[in-house]
Design a protein with these regions (language model features):
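Domain-level recognition of nuclease-like catalytic cores that cleave nucleotide substrates
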Residues: 103-128, 530-567
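Sensor-1/coupling segment of RecA-like P-loop NTPase cores
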Residues: 160-162, 166-169, 175-221
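Walker A/P-loop-proximal flanking segment of P-loop NTPase domains
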Residues: 1-47, 51-64
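Conserved catalytic cores of phosphodiester-cleaving nucleases, focusing on short active-site segments
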Residues: 445, 471, 480-511, 515-520, ...
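Helix-loop-helix "sensor" segment of P-loop NTPases
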Residues: 216-267
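P-loop NTPase nucleotide-binding core
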Residues: 37-38, 44-47, 51-167, 176-182, ...
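Short, amphipathic alpha-helical interaction segments positioned at domain boundaries
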Residues: 391-422
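Winged-helix-like regulatory helical subdomains adjacent to P-loop NTPase cores
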Residues: 271, 275-360
Length: 567
């Protein structure tokens, strides 16, 4: 079954995610000690959430298969979304993983005789539990609420009967909300919480692709699951991990892979694993079939063909994301109009600007923007402008609605012109979003190596000795209240140092309020705050920084610093 859900190719190209794997391992180890730590993983589609879950499952089966902790995995979109069908298939997946025979197909556990026969060999109390569920199913009008309650409690009954612990992994967890459409259920999350709270030997690890929806489920105080899960974001790779993945993908072409090729792939993909995969595969095709050189220009051509070509993997993922997202939005005409307008504005637009451009009332446009934010297509930024969450999707939408679609391989002249145009637009989008700078700053932090530099580059008088950071990541607190662009930490236990870094790449001076927010977030992490602003700072902000031991840098400072450390 593992090879069926986690193909050998995916296993071979798995890269890093060691922090997330360690967190999953910690949850498992704590469960063994009777402490339950539920986890929720959020991230864009195809960013790697499912792969890291399967890699955790694979490693567990290899090293702890006979231990006291049993792992189960199910992809909720594959389950029937009627209460009766869901309950039967939910229990079927659990039986498949818990019965210990992974050589059968999971579908063989979906019928009543198989479930009753299998559970009959797993202890009397557990068998009685499964029998009770099927007795309820035999009724003319089954109690749907009871069926789900019995299904959700199945792993706990097994754990109590067998003296085991169970981790239940639920991929694409928000799909469960479809059960709210049944009057007897009404609020499936409340039911799920009630069962979860009564359990003691089961831990849940869930994942979902709609960041906004995942945040509402796990961080909104009105949600039944508020504070029950630690929400972790799975983001794109940093430069080092992106390079490692590219080396694996392109090993058939060159070893080592040229540095300019590594840099070009990171530049166009921003480290998104699926975009890396798609671009690398097109590079292999273009070199193998069209005799292209292994160079940065070939990477840019590959990315352009993948993004604008109707057979491109990135093109089809973007189209899928758009179509799936708009299915959840009432009436597609106005949402599409808003998306088209926003696609042309890398810096984003305010509500008033969008309403004026479309000649519609602000109230109606606000409602559309709320819908689009709910399905993760757009976001409202700190400066109150709206824009796309994903610069690649923004670029694709701009070309898609303009009618440009490549149905074959264009001539070299046409392709070269398209590449130049697309790269210029893409860089403009990424730079306006600050995404390019965020990744560059992380690279910069990783290049710190004890160098001593002029303190004026950080807004202070005395020289600054740059720490040697062991780990550089973005940070989102479990309750969603504290978010920092980058947190960098040293590994020296005696002289441990941690920096909290915020980047604002907008066309205005950064003010005192923005610095106050970073200072508070840095204090919560016991970190030194470093604020980077493209345009610099107001006088009030400079005074605040001086009195609060903050480091400040402008675009010019950052450029000098990058040259000094060699990035």
């Amino acid at each position: 079954m593992l090879d069926y859900i986690y193909p050998e190719e995916e296993q071979r190209f798995f890269t890093n995610r060691e922090y997330t794997l360690a967190l999953l391992g910690l949850s498992r180890d704590l469960l063994g000690q009777g402490v339950r730590k539920h986890l929720a993983l959020s991230g864009f589609r195809r960013v790697g959430k499912t792969v890291v879950l399967k890699e955790f499952l694979r490693r567990h089966l290899e090293t702890n298969r006979g231990g006291d902790c049993r792992l189960t995995y199910m992809d909720l979109p594959r389950l029937a979304l009627t209460p009766e069908g869901f309950a039967v298939q939910y229990v079927g997946y659990l039986l498949y993983w818990l019965a210990g025979d992974l050589h059968q197909r999971v579908e063989s556990f979906f019928d009543a005789p198989a479930q009753l026969a299998t559970s009959g060999q797993m202890g009397a109390a557990f068998s009685e539990h499964v029998v009770r569920l099927h007795q309820e199913l035999q009724k003319e009008k089954p109690d749907q609420h009871l069926l789900l309650e019995l299904a959700f409690n199945t792993p706990e009954v097994y754990a109590q009967t067998a003296g085991k612990r169970v981790i239940v992994i639920l991929d694409e967890f928000p799909e469960i909300l479809a059960l709210d459409n049944y009057p007897q259920i009404h609020d499936v999350l409340a039911l799920f919480r009630a069962v979860l709270q009564a359990q003691s030997r089961v831990v849940y690890v869930v994942a979902g692709s709609m960041n906004g929806l995942m945040e509402r489920i796990f961080l909104d105080a009105a949600s039944p699951l508020f504070v029950h899960f630690q929400l972790e974001t799975i983001g794109p790779f940093g430069r080092e991990d992106c390079d490692a993945l590219v080396r694996k993908r392109l090993s058939m072409l060159a070893d080592p892979v040229p540095g300019d090729v590594l840099a070009a792939i990171y530049q166009v993909t921003r480290g998104h694993p699926f975009y890396v995969y798609a671009t690398a595969m097109r590079v292999i095709e273009n070199i193998s079939l069209l005799n292209k050189p292994l160079a940065s220009a070939t990477v840019q051509e590959a990315f352009t063909l993948e993004t604008l070509g109707s057979t491109g993997r990135i093109y089809n993922l973007c189209r899928y994301v758009l179509e799936q997202s708009l299915q959840g939005v009432r009436g597609e005409t106005m949402p599409q109009a808003v998306l088209q307008v926003l696609a042309q504005q890398p810096a984003g637009m305010t509500l008033t600007e969008i309403a004026a451009r479309l000649k519609r009332p602000s109230g109606a446009i606000r409602q559309v923007l709320t819908w689009l934010a709910d399905v993760d297509l757009v976001e409202q930024r700190e400066d109150k402008t709206y824009g796309y969450r994903d610069p690649v999707l923004q670029l694709w939408v701009a070309y898609y609605y303009s009618g440009l679609q490549l149905t074959g391989i264009p001539s070299q002249k046409v392709l070269s012109n398209l590449v130049a145009e697309l790269m210029e637009k893409y860089e403009r989008v990424a730079n306006e979003l600050g995404l390019a700078k965020e990744s560059q700053v992380r690279e910069l932090l990783e290049a710190f190596n004890g160098q001593e530099v002029d303190g004026r580059l950080f807004g202070v008088d005395s020289p600054v000795k740059l720490p040697v950071f062991e780990r550089v990541t973005s940070y989102l607190s479990p309750d969603g209240q504290v978010q920092v662009d980058s947190v960098a930490e040293t590994s020296d236990a005696e002289n441990h140092e941690r920096w909290a870094v915020e980047i604002k790449w907008r066309g205005r001076l950064s003010g005192k309020k923005e610095l106050e927010k970073l200072a508070a977030n840095a204090r919560s992490r016991s970190a030194k705050p470093w604020f980077i602003s493209k345009m610099g700072f107001t006088q009030e902000a400079l005074e605040f920084a001086r009195h609060n031991d903050m480091l400040l840098s402008s675009q010019a400072d950052l450029e000098v610093l990058a040259k000094l450390v060699g990035t």
